[in-house]
């Protein structure tokens, strides 16, 4: 293998490594997104249940091992804020995932280009 082929091979290996790292990050992001979606659904169900309650119903919040009485409206507001926060995090993770996918596509194209160049260099020898 001459110097040019070795350099091309090294560049291709670096691109492959970058691509694999992006794949790992993407997988982590997908898992994180699944957790967020689960939390969002759970909180929406809680809010639906809270909306079914009347003013005479009592709501308790768990603080460590103790149940503490909480106002119904305060509970609704807290759950609503949690839903907003989780929704923002979900949007942020979706945007990050889209950017990672674009980067992965660029790296995939670079790897293909380097593979082609390596094949051409090998054929010339």
UniProtKB/Swiss-Prot annotation:
Disulfide bonds: none annotated. The keyword Chaperone applies. GO terms for molecular function: protein-folding chaperone binding; unfolded protein binding. One of its GO terms (biological process) is protein folding. Transmembrane segments: none annotated. Keywords: Chaperone. The keyword Glycosyltransferase does not apply. GO terms for cellular component: cytoplasm; prefoldin complex. It holds the Pfam family Prefoldin_2. It comes from the Eukaryota. Gene3D superfamilies: 1.10.287.370. Binds specifically to cytosolic chaperonin (c-CPN) and transfers target proteins to it. Binds to nascent polypeptide chain and promotes folding in an environment in which there are many competing pathways for nonnative proteins. Belongs to the prefoldin subunit beta family. Heterohexamer of two PFD-alpha type and four PFD-beta type subunits. This is Probable prefoldin subunit 6. It comes from Drosophila melanogaster. The lineage of its organism: Eukaryota, Metazoa, Ecdysozoa, Arthropoda, Hexapoda.
